[in-house]
Amino acid sequence: MAVDFSMRQLLEAGAHFGHQAHRWNPKMQPYIFGTRNNIHIIDLAQTVPAMHQALQAVSDTVAKGGRVLFVGTKRQAADTIAEAAKRSAQYYVNSRWLGGMLTNWKTISGSISRLRKVTETLETGGPGLTKKERLMLSREKEKLEKALGGIKDMGGVPDLLFVIDTNKEQLAIKEANRLGIPVAAIVDTNCNPDGISYIVPANDDAGRAIALYCDLIAKAAIDGISRAQGSSGMDLGASEEPMAEELPANDDAAVTVESDALDPADVAMLAESTEHFELLAAPRGAPDDLTKLNGAGPQIVQKLNDAGIYHYWQLAAMTPEDVAKVDADLKLNGRIDRDSWVSQARGFVEAAAAA
């Protein structure tokens, strides 16, 4: 069964937001819809078919018995990458990429063997070892597990890489290119698409967007496993642990791309608003003057900026749960609610939209 998704899902996840116009890579020009508030807007009409190609490549690779390596070492991608790879019985690197991880697999294999040996020693209680020696082994295991835990069972170089943030993972991509391993990647407007076999133009920073990409790739891998088992003549119904089939949450979840596709004009319209609260690594365009909020002096605004809040639309999208968390994290002592920042922010957003 093909993996279905819609353009609306990409929009709601913020996949259409690129970077500030001055930070762009000119090679991404063909994938840019336009500019809004000095932010490049990615053409999701190209993202949708590109993602379909990447998903098909993943499914085909796994169906043929191949291995997919998820690569994403940035903070907001690390946990999501690991969860998606584990769920789909694939492999991942979510800590620092070690030089030679692909091109010097023999050395990496030696480190993996060491990890297994240390793990076995600790599991047996380390007979004959002093307390200090066991402590040293535990620390060594933690270090090796962090670096190699996601590939310790891979058994060889992968057959395809799925990458989040091609700028950060350049070394991984270069090694894959050197070995002729195809690469499917999320490519933002500030990235170089060279060396990517399956270019998926989309935002590579928003946590919600990253979660969507990883979920789709994981489902494609699971689809490949199902196809492989079906073609081998395996009776899935007779298995002691049959493959779990993920059902849509409702009848609308399996809608096809064509029936839910949005007009490109909607992309520009939604670029000015968002339906969910998120923290940003940097402002999208010029930051808003948050000192206009009741009781928000320069020091408080600096706190908000340091936490990743730069715009009124972020505050306007806050739920009561978001308000409580941010208030507690920044020690604002109830100021967000007390001074009605959310309603004020919504007013500023509406005024800007009407201008």
Swiss-Prot record:
Gene3D superfamilies: 5' to 3' exonuclease, C-terminal subdomain, Glucose-6-phosphate isomerase like protein, domain 1, Helix hairpin bin. It comes from the Bacteria. GO terms for cellular component: cytosolic small ribosomal subunit. One of its GO terms (molecular function) is structural constituent of ribosome. InterPro entries: Ribosomal_uS2, Ribosomal_uS2_bac/mit/plastid, Ribosomal_uS2_CS, Ribosomal_uS2_flav_dom_sf. SUPFAM superfamilies: Ribosomal protein S2 (SSF52313). Pfam families: Ribosomal_S2. One of its GO terms (biological process) is translation. Keywords: Ribonucleoprotein, Ribosomal protein. Belongs to the universal ribosomal protein uS2 family. This is Small ribosomal subunit protein uS2. It comes from Methylobacterium radiotolerans (strain ATCC 27329 / DSM 1819 / JCM 2831 / NBRC 15690 / NCIMB 10815 / 0-1). The gene is rpsB.
